[in-house]
């Protein structure tokens, strides 16, 4: 894989993680607006957000296996989210 392709895949992976974090923010916001929010579910989503943010902060352009895993795992999910 050439350097430009590595950076492209890295950027795609980071963006996918950010889309997922934003998606969980929306879910949390919607749940919090309910008359009786499910606090347990909110906490699960917050934990997931934290995990995704941590993955992003630790991700390196040279971590090609981690980048591939993120893109394979979150690619279909982020596409579905973006389609709404």
Sequence positions of predicted segments:
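N-terminal acidic leader/helix
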Residues: 2-35, 61, 78-81
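Amphipathic, hydrophobic secondary-structure cores in small proteins
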Residues: 35, 39-44
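Amphipathic alpha-helical coiled-coil segments
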Residues: 50-69
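Long amphipathic alpha-helical coiled-coil segments
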Residues: 64-82
């Amino acid at each position: 894989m050439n350097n430009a392709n590595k950076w492209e895949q890295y950027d795609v992976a980071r963006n996918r993680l950010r889309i997922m974090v934003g998606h969980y923010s929306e879910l949390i916001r919607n749940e919090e607006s309910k008359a009786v929010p499910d606090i347990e579910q909110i906490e699960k989503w917050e934990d997931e957000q934290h995990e995704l943010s941590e993955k992003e902060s630790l991700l390196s352009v040279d971590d090609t296996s981690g980048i591939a895993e993120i893109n394979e795992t979150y690619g279909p999910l982020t596409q579905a989210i973006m389609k709404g």
